[in-house]
C-alpha cells in the first residue's frame, strides 16, 4: 500500500494484498483458500476516490476465517459479512471522501460515501448491494462527533437492513 505524487495536488493511491489460508494438522475440513485485494485510487487536495475489489474465498463448506479482523470497517457497516460465508465473499466497491479544508466553521468536516456490490466466490450467488454514508466533525481538539448510515439491499444473502449510528470519540 502507498501513495505516489502525480503533480500538483494529485496523488495516486494503491493497495495490493494477498494471503493464503489452509487447514492444519488433523483438521477434517481439508481446504486452501485465498484472500486478495486490489485498490487503486486518486487523491486531489481534500478529495479522494478509490475503487476496490476484495475476495475472501470459500469452497462451499468453509469460508476464509478472519477471527481477529474488523470486517465492519471493510465489508460494509450493515455488518452482514462479519464472518465469511461458506461460498466466499467478493466485494467490489467505490469509496469517495472529502474533508473540508481551511479555518471556517466547517473546517475538518469529513464526508464519505461507499457503495458495495457483494457476491460469492463460488456458486455465482449475488448477495446484494450496500450504501454507506458518514459525516464526522471535530468538536475542539479532543472530541469528534460522527454519524454513520448503512443500507444493505439483499439479493441472495441475509435480509434488507438499515442501520444508523451516532458516536462521540475522544482523544486522551
Feature map (PLM): residue ranges:
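Surface-exposed extracellular loop regions of Gram-negative outer-membrane beta-barrel proteins
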Residues: 1-33, 145, 165-169
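Repeated loop/turn-to-beta-strand initiation elements of outer-membrane beta-barrel proteins
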Residues: 5-14, 46-50, 102-111, 139-147
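Transmembrane beta-strands of outer-membrane beta-barrel pores
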Residues: 18-24, 44-46, 53-59, 100, ...
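Outer-membrane beta-barrel "beta-signal"
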Residues: 94-96, 160-172
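C-terminal hydrophobic structural anchor segments
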Residues: 89-138
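Structural signature of outer-membrane beta-barrel channels/translocons
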Residues: 1-7, 41-45, 97-101, 136-142, ...
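Long, well-ordered mid-to-C-terminal structural blocks that present hydrophobic/aromatic surfaces
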Residues: 29-74
Amino acid at each position: 500500500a502507498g501513495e505516489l505524487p502525480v503533480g500538483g495536488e494529485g496523488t495516486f493511491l494503491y493497495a495490493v494484498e494477498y494471503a493464503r489460508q489452509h487447514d492444519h494438522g488433523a483438521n477434517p475440513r481439508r481446504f486452501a483458500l485465498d484472500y486478495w485485494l486490489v485498490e487503486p485510487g486518486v487523491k486531489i487536495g481534500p478529495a479522494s476516490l478509490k475503487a476496490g475489489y476484495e475476495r475472501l474465498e470459500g469452497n462451499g463448506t468453509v469460508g476464509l476465517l478472519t477471527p481477529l479482523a474488523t470486517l465492519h470497517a471493510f465489508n460494509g457497516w450493515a455488518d452482514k459479512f462479519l464472518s465469511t460465508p461458506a461460498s466466499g465473499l467478493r466485494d467490489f466497491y467505490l469509496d469517495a471522501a472529502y474533508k473540508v479544508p481551511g479555518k471556517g466553521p466547517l473546517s475538518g468536516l469529513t464526508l464519505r460515501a461507499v457503495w458495495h456490490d457483494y457476491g460469492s466466490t463460488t456458486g455465482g450467488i449475488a448477495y446484494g448491494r450496500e450504501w454507506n454514508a458518514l459525516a464526522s466533525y471535530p468538536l475542539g481538539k479532543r472530541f469528534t462527533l460522527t454519524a454513520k448510515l448503512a443500507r444493505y439491499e439483499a439479493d441472495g444473502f441475509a435480509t434488507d437492513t438499515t442501520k444508523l449510528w451516532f458516536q462521540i470519540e475522544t482523544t486522551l
